[in-house]
């Protein structure tokens, strides 16, 4: 997938599946893994998404991981921010390692690299703590956090699709008013 996969935007998926917005898509994805209470789940949306993916050869993402098609973009962010190395960590901080950014730029899947945490890379941290990429264990989003200085020259919008969080944005943002995707 990392070498031969083709990116498809969430915006495109929403249009094709007839979802109102990315919040509805998130609800369908999280319903597919049994990650929502029954009052929040949407099995009809889950089924529409599953059908669309099957018909169009789309591999839906797995929860709680940096997707293969995002991995090079994540490495690029740290490289463009001026870092030659970064800290990679597992979910709980039990296994953190300082690795060269070039290791993450390889065409190999991070899950199969012996130099990286045994139970998967869930966090990427700049050595000076000015930039962090984190994936929530039971969700389908990647959060990229940074200082104003760290983000100043980064063109995150050109690498990823998403929205800018505010101080009020919660981990379970699908229950909040929908934040528009950045154009």
Located regions from the model:
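Low-complexity, charged, repeat-rich alpha-helical/coil interaction segments
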Residues: 1-2, 8, 15-18, 23, ...
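Alpha-helical oligomerization segments
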Residues: 133-183
């Amino acid at each position: 997938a990392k070498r031969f996969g083709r990116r498809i935007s969430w915006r495109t998926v929403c249009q094709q599946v007839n979802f109102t917005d990315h919040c509805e898509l998130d609800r369908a994805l999280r319903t597919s893994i049994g990650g929502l209470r029954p009052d929040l789940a949407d099995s009809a949306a889950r089924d529409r998404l599953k059908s669309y993916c099957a018909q169009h050869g789309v591999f839906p993402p797995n929860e709680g991981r940096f997707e293969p098609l995002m991995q090079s973009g994540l490495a690029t962010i740290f490289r463009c921010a001026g870092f030659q190395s970064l800290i990679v960590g597992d979910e709980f901080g039990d296994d953190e390692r300082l690795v060269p950014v070039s290791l993450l730029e390889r065409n190999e899947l991070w899950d199969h690299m012996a130099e990286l945490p045994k139970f998967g890379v869930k966090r990427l941290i700049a050595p000076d703590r000015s930039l962090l990429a984190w994936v929530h264990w039971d969700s389908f989003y990647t959060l990229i956090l940074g200082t104003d200085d760290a983000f100043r020259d980064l063109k995150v919008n050109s690498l990823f699709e998403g929205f800018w969080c505010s101080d009020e944005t919660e981990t379970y943002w699908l229950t909040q008013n929908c934040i528009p995707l950045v154009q």
